[in-house]
Amino acid sequence: MDSNTVSSFQVDCFLWHVRKQVVDQELGDAPFLDRLRRDQKSLRGRGSTLGLNIEAATRVGKQIVERILKEESDEALKMTMASAPASRYLTDMTIEELSRDWFMLMPKQKVEGPLCIRIDQAIMDKNIMLKANFSVIFDRLETLILLRAFTEEGAIVGEISPLPSLPGHTIEDVKNAIGVLIGGLEWNDNTVRVSKTLQRFAWRSSNENGRHPLTPKQKQ
């Protein structure tokens, strides 16, 4: 077994432990908690593959990190932080569109993972645009703040929002929720398009209608 593979796993285990302490002290936000959960699953899988005990690996990882920090200069740390990527907040919607109250004539609500989807089933034969405000890191959607569906007249007819009781979501969660929202709106012969910002950072690829093709699950 390659020694670098082992040491990498040990350091990752210790860093996960540190991040868990941050969450336990209620200092982490939703994206932080989401990454923590995903990395926990990854570490369990890696530990099983390598045949290594996570608790023992965490202790060794702590020793490795402590040794590195002891040798690290403050100047080197500043340079590392300066070069680290920062998340960006992108806005399709104005403050008014983001905060506007709306109601549904024929309400339908569905929970898809940690996201809540709301659709007004009374809307028919409309051209609809999906807009969203969200943060981006590494050119991918990091955290969805709110997504809303607007008619050409500016009426809100659908929405996707994070559930406060289930913090943290992945880009796949967002894609699935968008698919459900689009499928629900198209059921009533509405034409749905996705904003260029969402296409670029959340969908990666789109068809000629400006949106990602739906999977069979999303069409339901």
UniProtKB/Swiss-Prot annotation:
GO terms for cellular component: host cell cytoplasm; host cell nucleus. Coiled coil: none annotated. It is found in: Host nucleus; Host cytoplasm. A motif (Nuclear export signal) lies at residues 137-146. Keywords: Eukaryotic host gene expression shutoff by virus, Host cytoplasm, Host gene expression shutoff by virus, Host mRNA suppression by virus, Host nucleus, Host-virus interaction, Inhibition of host innate immune response by virus, Inhibition of host interferon signaling pathway by virus, Inhibition of host PKR by virus, Inhibition of host pre-mRNA processing by virus, Inhibition of host RIG-I by virus, Inhibition of host RLR pathway by virus, Interferon antiviral system evasion, RNA-binding, Ubl conjugation, Viral immunoevasion. Upon interferon induction, ISGylated via host HERC5; this results in the impairment of NS1 interaction with RNA targets due to its inability to form homodimers and to interact with host EIF2AK2/PKR. This is Non-structural protein 1. It comes from Influenza A virus (strain A/Tokyo/3/1967 H2N2). The lineage of its organism: Viruses, Riboviria, Orthornavirae, Negarnaviricota, Polyploviricotina.
